[in-house]
Amino acid sequence: MLDSTNGTGVQGHVEDGWGKVADVFRANFEGTPGEVGAACCVYVDGRPVVDLRGGLADREANRPWNEDTIALVASTTKGATAICAHLLAQRGELDLDAPVVKYWPEFGAAGKEHIPVRWLLSHQAGLPIVDGPLTFEDACAWHPVIRSLEAQKPEWQPGTEHVYHSMTFGFLVGEVVRRITGRSLGTFFADEVAAPLGLSAWIGLPEAQEGRVARIGYAAPFTLEEMTAGMIETTGLDRDTVIAWMNAVWGPDSVQARAGQLGGAFDHTSGYMNTRAFRAAEFPFGNMFSDARSLARMYAATVSEVDGVRLLNPATVEKMTVVHTDKTKMNGLPPGLDVPANRSFYMSLGFWRACPPMPFVGPGSFGHPGSGGSVAFADPDAGVGFGYVTNLWSFRIGEPRASNLAAAVTACLGSRR
């Protein structure tokens, strides 16, 4: 049991040989940006070896981050959504090579009739953008977004390009799950993943859990200038090249900027993420609320048995982690302007694989990060499940808090061999 006296309030459990992770976790509170509140958990071979928490869940209210605190994990949600799809595939209820229209006939409009399910998971469906117009209330209601996706024409020939489907991923995969099971993605996750493992994790937060939620704060405004500065620092490229790349990827008319608006439903300056309406909705692309322990436990159960429960068998893990896209090129970039080598990432069926921006703990690792800093992953070879959550959101590219923790886990694993 740890009980910090350095003002960060770091508490928890660390087994012998895992002290480096605790050292990095404490140091994160003193770095730039310094943590407000956070938690980190590591499972190895189905049991926890690190379970840490510290800081404040709500800086304004001076509320401490305790054992029951949960936080928004943003796109780390996508990993949980993908696990749900692969559970159905493992059970023989979902064929990843079948066209989406087998399960969702209305999806076939506007030239989408041949898109296979796997392209929804690998971000190759050509549907990162919804023309709309949609409102936030439409997104919360689910079906208006589904109707828009049914009518949407792909931005390019499906299967030929990879672009991150930041918002639509959750609606696309979630609707397939709903058509097969008759349950929303959030309900399926609660029944088939969270309940068997005893997780404190929800996609669609029950009102009874509101008092546990950490309040989000920001290390700095989410600006193109901030992201550009981080890119210069982490790539070593000259400013003109970085500005050209960032404008192409994140400028106001770029594919990614339009994708993040979901047809006008999301205004990223409105502070909606701290509202009850956002928390209560089911957004399988990015509004799971969880503690670090649950993230680590969930991923651990994909590669090993956890208290008698294993979610996915080795054959399923092998199939779902095959790299489908090597993101060294990105749709919408000017000719000759590729993704810098140390920013490339590799996407399998719903998961990031180990890559330069997020090496995890080894070449076999798979998982998903989230905007603001959260991350969760597993490593089949090491038997690792890892989860990290924070309420101090930073959009700095190369943001080191989670990657430093993962590096410490890697070092501890190495010392055990």
Predicted features along the sequence, with ranges:
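Active-site helix/loop module of the DD-peptidase/beta-lactamase fold
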Residues: 67, 72-76, 90-132, 150-151, ...
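Structured C-terminal helix/loop/strand segments within mature extracytoplasmic catalytic/sensor domains
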Residues: 368-417
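Short, conserved catalytic-motif segment at the N-terminal edge
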Residues: 11-73, 95, 151
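Short, gly/Ser/Thr-rich active-site loops of penicillin-recognizing serine hydrolases
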Residues: 304-307, 316, 321-334, 396-417
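Active-site SXXK
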Residues: 22-26, 46, 70-97, 173-178, ...
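Flexible glycine/proline-enriched surface loops and loop-helix/loop-strand junctions
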Residues: 66, 152-159, 169-172, 275-284
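Active-site Gly/Thr loop motif
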Residues: 220-290, 322-381
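Active-site-proximal alpha-helical segments within enzyme catalytic domains
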Residues: 123, 169-176, 282, 286-308, ...
